[in-house]
């Protein structure tokens, strides 16, 4: 048989995808079943990590799975004499328009080892023929630096794909810090109209060295105009290397981009947590990466720098409280539980105690609170008890008018989603899981990785009044035992709770014996400032005998 085009072959192995042509999705039930995820809400199976094009009758599979296994499955559905396969090696890409030089050397052996792996040097030379690489480095170990070195050394036009536009801005600034690249050589692809102009040759942005883009931009354009247009975009830009930042996120979208840009020379999957929160999706993610060369350089003797402190207490929910917080699908509804906490006096005693300790010890702190309404209540509580901190507390969520400015504050209120993977919040001394329960290993490692300096602390408030939360705590213990410098668990019983409540009262009473120091110009008096800002209340020494809640 004479094959006129690559689409005539039954099975084609590309750089980041395996394509099965002229097939139906039902032709390979045992193969497809491995990528199925049961949707508890809609009660159906969704497929993750693969894609089927019904119009062209093409099945796209990840390149990282066993090629021979796929071959056998495909051959079993047809006459062996009719089976045909092809390995596509296009490797069409452009060089950077201007040579990019590094400004600094690797700072330690970890970065040197990661660079040797990414560039297939030394003992990693055997990977030279590979097209996909997984670089798994702990938060703060320099994933952006490694990507910059790879791009600089190879001199190939590249693209960085992240989940958020703000993280792209971090990449831009870090790459400019590490290299001598001109800012004009970095292009941030924003919106479908810009992609359309590039495809129509009406944009001056199609001849640069580095491109930055979010998953959502490519996903929206691919869903609207067809994923083949995304592949055409990469061809137009001459991209030879793509970097997926926090590769475990946006998993299905990453797979679709891999399938659409299947002939890009090399793909680097960069993350600190190479796994998925959902157990079924985690199995598929590991299958997706099964044969992708990877490196994980975590050293517990050196890299573990944050201590873990679990503070257990009992909010004493009534049976009706427990029932009201239930979710038929997931067991416990986080929003309902957090709303319950906002009405629970024991929680507020624990919060006042933890915040007073952090306030007195000094240092920057990040508080995880699961909902925006709860964040506003915690903010009001801080302002009520510590009015002098009016300019030191930031809200880092969608309700904030200036999220980036909020990251510079001394006390930051956020959610695990807002301050998720890839976020850079410098100089944190404390991370406090205050009112956002989770048991995901991925989220646990991400939140633990927010503090990057030595001698920092990760504090978790655990409500043992709900058995689900005790289960969450038990599920995460092994993570802290491995990745934290040390672990400590303390239980606050009723006598202890009364003691810390009294200790907090004394601290508040002593604070208001003297004029408060505000983060304002020295010539503004504290009292007049309080009145000017219309702060609800301040306790003075004569008013602390009866505490107002």
Tell where the protein language model's regions lie, with residue ranges:
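Conserved two-lobed SF2 helicase motor
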Residues: 205-224, 407-420
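A conserved SF2-helicase RecA2
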Residues: 289-299, 453-516
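Conserved RecA-like P-loop NTPase helicase motor core
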Residues: 398-479
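Conserved interdomain linker/interface between the two RecA-like ATPase lobes of SF2 helicase motors
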Residues: 294-363
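Conserved helix-turn-beta segment of the N-terminal RecA-like "Helicase ATP-binding" lobe
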Residues: 167-193, 386-388
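Conserved Walker A/P-loop ATP-binding site and its immediately adjacent core
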Residues: 146, 153-178, 371-375
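Walker A/P-loop
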Residues: 126-150
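Post-DEXD/H (motif II) to motif III coupling segment of the RecA-like Helicase ATP-binding lobe
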Residues: 246-304
């Amino acid at each position: 048989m004479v094959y006129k085009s690559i689409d005539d072959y039954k099975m084609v192995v590309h750089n980041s995808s395996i394509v099965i042509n002229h097939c139906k999705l039902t032709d390979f039930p045992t193969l497809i079943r491995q990528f199925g995820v049961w949707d508890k809400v809609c009660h159906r199976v969704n497929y993750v990590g693969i894609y089927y094009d019904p119009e062209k009758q093409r099945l796209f599979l990840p390149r990282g799975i066993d090629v021979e296994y796929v071959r056998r499955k495909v051959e079993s559905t047809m006459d062996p004499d009719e089976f045909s396969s092809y390995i596509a090696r296009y490797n069409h890409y452009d060089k950077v328009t201007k040579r990019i030089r590094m400004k600094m050397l690797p700072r330690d052996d970890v970065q040197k080892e990661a660079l040797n792996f990414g560039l297939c040097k030394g003992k990693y030379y055997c990977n030279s023929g590979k097209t996909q690489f997984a670089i798994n480095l702990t938060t703060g170990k320099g994933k952006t630096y490694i990507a910059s070195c790879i791009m600089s050394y190879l001199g190939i036009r590249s693209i960085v794909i992240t989940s958020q536009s703000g993280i792209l801005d971090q990449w831009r600034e870090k790459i400019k810090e590490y290299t001598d690249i001109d800012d004009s050589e970095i292009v941030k692809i924003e919106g479908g109209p810009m992609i359309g102009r590039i495809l129509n040759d009406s944009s001056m942005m199609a001849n640069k060295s580095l491109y930055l883009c979010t998953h959502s931009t490519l996903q929206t354009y691919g869903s609207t105009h067809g994923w083949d247009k995304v592949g055409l975009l990469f061809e137009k830009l001459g991209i030879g290397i793509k970097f997926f930042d926090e590769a475990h996120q946006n998993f299905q979208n990453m797979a679709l981009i891999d399938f659409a840009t299947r002939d890009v020379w090399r793909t680097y999957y960069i993350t600190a947590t190479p796994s998925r929160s959902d157990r079924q999706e985690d199995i598929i993610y590991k299958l997706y990466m099964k044969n992708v060369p990877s490196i994980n350089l975590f050293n517990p003797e050196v890299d573990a720098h944050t201590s873990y402190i679990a503070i257990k207490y009992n909010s004493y929910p009534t049976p009706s409280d427990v029932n009201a917080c239930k979710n038929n699908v997931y067991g416990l509804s986080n929003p309902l539980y957090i709303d319950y906490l906002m009405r629970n006096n024991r929680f507020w005693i624990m919060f006042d105690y933890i915040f007073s300790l952090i306030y007195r010890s000094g240092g920057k702190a990040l508080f995880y609170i699961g909902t925006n309404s709860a964040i506003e209540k915690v903010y009001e509580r801080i302002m009520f008890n510590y009015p002098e901190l009016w300019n030191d507390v930031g809200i880092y969520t969608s309700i904030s008018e200036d999220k980036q400015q909020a990251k510079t504050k001394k006390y930051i209120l956020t959610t695990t989603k807002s301050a998720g993977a890839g976020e850079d919040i410098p100089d944190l001394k404390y991370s406090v899981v205050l009112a956002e329960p989770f048991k995901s290993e991925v989220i646990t490692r991400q939140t633990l990785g927010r503090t990057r300096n030595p001698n920092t602390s990760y504090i978790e408030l655990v409500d043992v009044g709900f058995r689900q939360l005790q289960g969450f705590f038990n599920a995460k213990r092994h993570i802290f035992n491995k990745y934290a410098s040390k672990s400590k668990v303390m239980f606050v019983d009723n006598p202890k709770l009364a003691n810390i409540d009294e200790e907090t009262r004394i601290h508040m009473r002593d604070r208001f014996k003297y004029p408060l120091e505000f983060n304002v110009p020295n010539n503004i008096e504290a009292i007049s400032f309080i009145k000017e800002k219309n702060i609800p209340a301040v306790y003075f020494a004569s008013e602390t005998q009866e505490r107002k809640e």
